């Protein structure tokens, strides 16, 4: 998957979620990050739980900036926005995911689709507890082999 998705110039692989960033990001986050534009609002939000980064000066700079924004209480907290009204359809603030998504849009970082789920399992023991009922994915086969080894 990585070989087919990344090229030599990519510094990261970030994974696309299903929800609009504007529905999952409070307005203060957009405003304080200078990202209060429709491109940021209308793009799908990334999932921050699984990321791949190439170690290089550019990726280190972006991750350091991500941390800086995540340490800004006005950007990261779940309190209602004070700098502007929440966008139509706003559901709730996804904190670090919101910040990461804004940075990825701004910097044009590489984003992969949902097919990565065929290769990862976050809670691998969970489906074992349901009688080895996996989903037939490659990761399910691999984890079953590990369990039975």
Model-derived features: positions:
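Glycosyltransferase catalytic domains, chiefly GT-A lineage
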Residues: 1-149
């Amino acid at each position: 998957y990585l070989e087919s998705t990344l090229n030599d110039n990519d510094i990261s692989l970030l994974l696309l979620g299903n929800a609009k960033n504007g529905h999952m990001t409070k307005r203060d986050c957009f405003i304080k990050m200078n990202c209060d534009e429709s491109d940021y609002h209308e793009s799908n939000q990334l999932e921050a739980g699984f990321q791949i980064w190439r170690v290089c000066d550019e990726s280190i700079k972006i991750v350091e900036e991500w941390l800086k924004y995540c340490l800004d209480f006005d950007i990261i907290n779940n309190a209602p926005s004070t700098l502007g009204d929440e966008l139509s359809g706003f559901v709730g603030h996804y904190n670090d995911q919101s910040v990461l998504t804004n940075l990825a849009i701004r910097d044009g970082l590489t984003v992969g689709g949902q097919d990565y789920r065929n290769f990862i399992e976050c809670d691998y023991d969970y489906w074992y507890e349901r009688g080895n009922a996996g989903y037939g994915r490659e990761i399910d086969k691999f984890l079953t082999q590990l369990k039975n080894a």
